[in-house]
UniProtKB/Swiss-Prot annotation:
<dbReference type="InterPro" id="IPR014325">
    <property type="entry name" value="RNA_pol_sigma-E_actinobac"/>
</dbReference>
<dbReference type="InterPro" id="IPR039425">
    <property type="entry name" value="RNA_pol_sigma-70-like"/>
</dbReference>
<dbReference type="InterPro" id="IPR007627">
    <property type="entry name" value="RNA_pol_sigma70_r2"/>
</dbReference>
<dbReference type="GO" id="GO:0003677">
    <property type="term" value="F:DNA binding"/>
</dbReference>
<comment type="similarity">
    <text>Belongs to the sigma-70 factor family. ECF subfamily.</text>
</comment>
<keyword id="KW-0731">Sigma factor</keyword>
<dbReference type="InterPro" id="IPR013324">
    <property type="entry name" value="RNA_pol_sigma_r3/r4-like"/>
</dbReference>
<dbReference type="Pfam" id="PF08281">
    <property type="entry name" value="Sigma70_r4_2"/>
</dbReference>
<dbReference type="InterPro" id="IPR014284">
    <property type="entry name" value="RNA_pol_sigma-70_dom"/>
</dbReference>
<dbReference type="InterPro" id="IPR013249">
    <property type="entry name" value="RNA_pol_sigma70_r4_t2"/>
</dbReference>
<dbReference type="GO" id="GO:0005737">
    <property type="term" value="C:cytoplasm"/>
</dbReference>
<dbReference type="InterPro" id="IPR036388">
    <property type="entry name" value="WH-like_DNA-bd_sf"/>
</dbReference>
<comment type="function">
    <text>Sigma factors are initiation factors that promote the attachment of RNA polymerase to specific initiation sites and are then released. This sigma factor is required for normal cell wall integrity; it is recruited by RNA polymerase to transcribe genes with cell wall-related functions. It is also involved in the transcription of the dagA gene coding for an extracellular agar-degrading enzyme.</text>
</comment>
<protein>
    <recommendedName>
        <fullName>RNA polymerase sigma-E factor</fullName>
    </recommendedName>
</protein>
<dbReference type="InterPro" id="IPR000838">
    <property type="entry name" value="RNA_pol_sigma70_ECF_CS"/>
</dbReference>
<dbReference type="InterPro" id="IPR013325">
    <property type="entry name" value="RNA_pol_sigma_r2"/>
</dbReference>
<keyword id="KW-0963">Cytoplasm</keyword>
Amino acid sequence: MGEVLEFEEYVRTRQDALLRSARRLVPDPVDAQDLLQTALARTYGRWETIEDKRLADAYLRRVMINTRTEWWRARKLEEVPTEQLPESPMDDATEQHADRALLMDVLKVLAPKQRSVVVLRHWEQMSTEETAAALGMSAGTVKSTLHRALARLREELVARDLDARALEREERERCAA
C-alpha cells in the first residue's frame, strides 16, 4: 500500500514537468497526454523495482521515449509519403510562440533518437552524462548524435527560410504584374 501512495504522490508532484517533457517529444497535446499516461501506467507496474526514487524522472522519460518510438514505428508503416507536407497551424499571438511552433515542427525531420537527444540536452537541460544514462548510450554517442541533429536542424531552417523568401518574391512579382 505504501508503494501505491508513494507513486501517487510522485505523480501529483511531477505531473506538470512530465507533461512538458511529453510535449517536447510529441507535438500534439493530446498525443502528449496519451504518451504520459501510457508511460505512467508502464512505470506503475515496475515502481517497486526503481530502487533510487530520485532517478524516477529519468526512468519515466526513458519509458516515454521508448513508447514514442514504438508509436512512431507503428505509424511509419501507415504513413503515405506526400510531395509536400501540410503546414501546421500556428497561433501567432507572439513571435516567441511562433518560433517555438517552428522549432517543434522542424524537430519532426529528425529521427527519434536524434530528437530525444536534442530534447533532453536543450529543452530538459540535461548534461551529456545524464542524457547518455537516460537513453542508454555512451556520452560520445550523445555528442555525435547531437552534433548531427543540430546540423540537420540548421539545414532544415535554412531551407525553410529560402522557401519562404522565394514565395515572397513570387508574390511581389505577381502583384507587380
